[in-house]
From Swiss-Prot:
This is Histidine--tRNA ligase. It catalyses: tRNA(His) + L-histidine + ATP = L-histidyl-tRNA(His) + AMP + diphosphate + H(+). Homodimer. Belongs to the class-II aminoacyl-tRNA synthetase family. GO terms for biological process: histidyl-tRNA aminoacylation.
Amino acid sequence: MPEPIRAVRGMNDILPDESGLWAFFEDTIRTWLAAYGYRNLRTPIVEQTDLFVRSIGEVTDIVEKEMYTFVDHLNGENLTLRPEGTASCVRAVIEHNLLYAGPQRLYYSGPMFRHERPQKGRYRQFHQVGVEALGFAGPDIDAELIVMCARLWRLLGISDVRLEISTLGSTESRSVYRARLISYLEKFCDDLDEDARRRLKTNPLRILDSKNPAMREILAGAPRLFDDLDEDSLAHFEALQRILRNQDISFEINNRLVRGLDYYNRTVFEWVTDKLGAQGTICAGGRYDGLIAQIGGKPAPACGFAMGIERILALMGENGAVGAHAIPDIYVVHQGEAAAEFSWKVAESLRDDGLKVVLHSGGGNFKAQMKKADASGARFAAIIGEDEVVAGQISIKPLREAAEQIRVDLAGAAALLGNI
């Protein structure tokens, strides 16, 4: 007997008992985003590798170590399974000239892929919802995105999260700070861990995000990015804080907050929880005013965020949330050949009336079928025997209430069930 084939490590099946919670989340997301005027954009899972090299940054962990990249043997193109969604969204906006009609509020959802070490809350295939506001320059749109998130947490019953915000300033002010940070860290060159030494000359701001306790001790005395902020970036950040306070959104300023993608500038933010261990960030984003031009479009400001669906569902599970199973309204049982044929008509007629119906399949006597009807969770069993076939009727037996079995015409069954 051959060995069974299993799912790829770090890429998980979503089983029927779990999919109810996914469906609830997805329905909530669509309603929530429509309330703010955001429209859905769907992009391919596979993109040109250069899209991510240009946008995310050539010396980031994602591009250097985590992307699933391959060469198309038909034409030699270098292709990559998307590791994140913002670059694909921006590419589509440029390619289809969407900004010609004015600023755009867009969102996407779907699977992303990174070749990481699988652990709780971190998978090689994971799912994100991303929200992007393109063509908006002011701090008001930054605030809108954060306020949107706060509303979503309420809709999902999530309360154990906190908001951390910061600013990365402009490209120019960040360059000044980068030089000061390198100069400071070089004094501790022998004490830096391997990751920090690698990043020192390529992406030193990412060192600020180190979780290594020894590195945190070194970083405690590091210069602050705030000290090198340009006036416009500082004014932008102060305006954002005013709006958040006016909207009663609590936040913490985290001077060490940086993002793992190179394209961010000015506002950055994360929603964090302590209930998921090391993978505590459930939503993160910020402003990326240079990305559209970087990918080849006409310069335009932009801001957005992405949230990890698996982490949010895990947090909902910690709070006791469960998804609704696809429980039928009615389970159709039948005895005899004529009844089996008539049961098809009954099931389809009830479905036409908007009911969720399971038609018994696989044979079995009446008692066995009724056990399956009860196990299905349905409120009612529709019983069809020879007498029902002759009369063109069905017998309705309540399964969850102490009520009498009744026989009704098929045409009036749905209305009757709605009144019981």
